[in-house]
């Protein structure tokens, strides 16, 4: 079996220390499951700017395109707040997503039994929650042209962005969403604002057409984005798979993230088009940011990044058994009462980033025995 090519981009802030714990899991997979990984490490975001004067060096893109999958820690921080817009760390992340053709962002929002009380909502509202939010990643309001800030003849200024989608862009994200729904519970909710925005009228029309022509076995419903935000808080378990536009998905997935109690628990995957062999370019990253306030203090929760690697095994390497093993190990560690600061509960044991990573490795040993 050929070695799996992984590009690791620790990034900024806590990205470095949480990625160190993922390296433990990767090493364990090599030793105990005999999976060979060929690992390259690169720079992205503020760390790249400090070395190269750009948040997105050419060699990082080259390495990403050569890899089977990319693992990212986090980018950004106040250190780089005053940089020009095109030099900010976040431009590196947007750039690599665009150049890798990563159009489908998968954001699971799952409430583990041990953490049902950690949510800000009542346990009975979120217990057993398992939602997959699919966000279109390379079109919509974040990338549409024209965009900019202009100074008008009278001296006032005008800022503008454009919401644009084409039929092929909608169809490709739709197919990923319907396929995910088909593999889960055959329920898909498409979120738009078709009562106001013509672009999302087209979105809704294309989703309906796709369902009729290619996915008649999947139940398709539609919801306006403002109602979807309300329903995620009111009755989140009504949803299974949700699909939506770039900005809507950015907002709704963060809303859904807090149903689980902590951003430190949530992984994500960004996928590109399937090639002739069915393989996709892919980038995996935790939902949380770089958390500069706790960076370097061994306090960060590494579980979202570890679970992102589990998603990598599942979606890029077709290793569902190994992905399940990691997810079960994480569940068991939490059942055992270990908590990082962000998910700390009364009566539980508060541990560091390093100790949490070590605990997951020990649990993997038990499960693999």
Curated annotation (Swiss-Prot):
Pathway: Amino-acid biosynthesis; L-leucine biosynthesis; L-leucine from 3-methyl-2-oxobutanoate: step 3/4. PROSITE patterns: IDH_IMDH. Substrate binds at residues 97, 107, 135, 226. Gene3D superfamilies: Isopropylmalate Dehydrogenase. It catalyses: (2R,3S)-3-isopropylmalate + NAD(+) = 4-methyl-2-oxopentanoate + CO2 + NADH. It is an enzyme of class 1 (oxidoreductase). It is found in: Cytoplasm. SUPFAM superfamilies: Isocitrate/Isopropylmalate dehydrogenase-like. Signal peptide: none annotated. GO terms for biological process: L-leucine biosynthetic process. This is 3-isopropylmalate dehydrogenase.
């Amino acid at each position: 079996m050929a070695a799996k090519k992984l590009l690791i981009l620790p990034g900024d802030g806590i990205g470095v220390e949480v990625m160190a714990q993922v390296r433990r899991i990767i090493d364990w997979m090599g030793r105990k499951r005999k999976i060979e990984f060929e690992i390259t490490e690169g720079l992205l975001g503020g760390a790249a700017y400090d070395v190269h004067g750009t948040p997105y060096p050419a060699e990082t893109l080259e390495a990403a395109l050569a890899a089977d999958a990319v693992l990212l820690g986090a980018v950004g921080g106040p250190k780089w707040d005053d940089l020009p817009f095109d030099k900010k760390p976040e431009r590196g992340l947007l750039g690599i997503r665009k150049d890798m053709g990563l159009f489908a962002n998968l954001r699971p929002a799952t409430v583990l039994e041990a953490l049902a009380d950690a949510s800000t909502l009542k346990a009975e509202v979120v217990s057993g929650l398992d939602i997959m939010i699919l966000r279109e990643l390379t079109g919509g309001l974040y990338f549409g042209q024209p965009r900019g800030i202009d100074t008008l003849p009278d001296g006032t200024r005008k800022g503008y962005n454009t919401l644009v989608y084409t039929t092929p862009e909608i169809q490709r994200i739709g197919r990923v969403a319907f396929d995910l729904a088909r593999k889960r519970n055959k329920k898909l909710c498409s979120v738009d604002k078709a009562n106001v925005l013509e672009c999302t009228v087209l979105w809704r029309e294309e989703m309906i057409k796709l369902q009729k022509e290619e996915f008649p076995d999947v139940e398709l419903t539609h919801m306006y984005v403002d109602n979807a935000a309300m329903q995620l808080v009111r009755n989140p378990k009504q949803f299974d798979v949700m699909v939506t536009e770039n900005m809507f998905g950015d907002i709704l997935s963060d809303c859904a993230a807090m149903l689980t109690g902590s951003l430190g628990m949530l992984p994500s995957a960004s996928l590109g088009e399937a090639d002739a062999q069915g393989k996709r370019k892919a980038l995996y990253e935790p939902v949380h940011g770089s958390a500069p306030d706790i960076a370097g203090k061994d306090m960060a929760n590494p579980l979202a990044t570890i679970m992102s690697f589990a998603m990598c095994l599942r979606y890029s390497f077709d290793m569902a058994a190994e992905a399940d093993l990691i997810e079960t190990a994480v569940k068991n560690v939490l059942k055992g009462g270990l908590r990082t600061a962000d998910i700390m509960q009364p009566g539980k044991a508060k541990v560091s980033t390093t100790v949490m990573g070590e605990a997951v490795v020990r649990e993997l040993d038990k499960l693999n025995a």
